[in-house]
Design a protein with these regions (language model features):
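Short beta-strand/loop segments at the ligand-binding rim of alpha/beta enzyme cores
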Residues: 76-85
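Short, flexible loop/turn motifs enriched in small residues
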Residues: 28-32
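Glycine-biased flexible loop/turn sites that connect beta-strands or occur in inter-domain linkers
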Residues: 42-43
Length: 207
């Protein structure tokens, strides 16, 4: 499958499979992060889930999807190496670890950590990665501001930023996909507004 077709399918899944369950989750007081696990062979959805922190603060969108995936009967659950992992938002440190420990060799995401902070008013992904993992240089006692927050390609997995993938396409494919991303930006802006209105009222530690 060519890159444009892959991206189109991933946007389909966000719009048709993840966003509807996320809308219900946000209505209950959860954050707007969601995820899906697809078969690499035909890009069919195995599970699509959303954040469920009002039940357990560890049930971020990705972690909740992983939980549901491993609850499937073994004969209905594909091997993780045969799966594509899709997150609406760039995974936080918890979810990066969950993806790694679960054995997935990839993940794709639409919104970046910076988007989570700047567009959705949820700054904890960057804050925690910097506070917990960014060890200062012994010589200076500081951390370089240009230091990456994590290794986006490593021995366990390779990450894929969908917006950057679109930017690398030729114009004939790019314009339609950019328009679809704009629509998803609007959709998630509405979800964010709904979450922010009730934020802090459901007992989520880092709301």
């Amino acid at each position: 499958m060519d890159t444009a077709s892959l991206i189109s399918r991933l946007l389909d899944v966000i719009e048709a499979d993840i966003a509807p369950v996320t809308r219900k989750g946000v209505a209950r007081g959860n954050k707007l992060f969601g995820a899906a696990i697809l078969r690499k062979s035909d890009l069919s959805v195995v599970v699509a889930e959303t954040n469920n922190e009002i039940e357990n603060p560890l049930w971020h969108g990705e972690m909740h999807a992983i939980k549901r995936f491993f609850e499937l009967p073994g004969d209905k659950r594909p091997d993780v190496k045969d799966c594509l992992f899709l997150a609406t938002h760039e995974p936080c440190s918890l979810c990066l670890s969950g993806i790694t420990w679960s054995g997935f060799d990839n993940f794709y995401y639409l919104f970046s950590h910076e988007d989570s902070r700047d567009s959705f008013a949820i700054p904890y992904d960057i804050q925690i990665l910097k506070a917990v993992y960014a060890v200062p240089e012994p010589e200076t006692g500081t951390v370089s501001p240009d230091r990456p927050l994590y290794n986006r390609a490593n021995q366990y997995w390779t990450s894929h930023n969908i917006v950057q993938m679109i930017a690398g396409l030729d114009r004939s494919h790019k314009e339609e996909l950019v328009a679809r991303v704009d629509d998803l930006n609007a959709l998630y802006a509405d979800l964010s507004a709904a979450y922010q209105q009730d934020k802090g009222s459901k007992g989520i530690p880092l709301a």
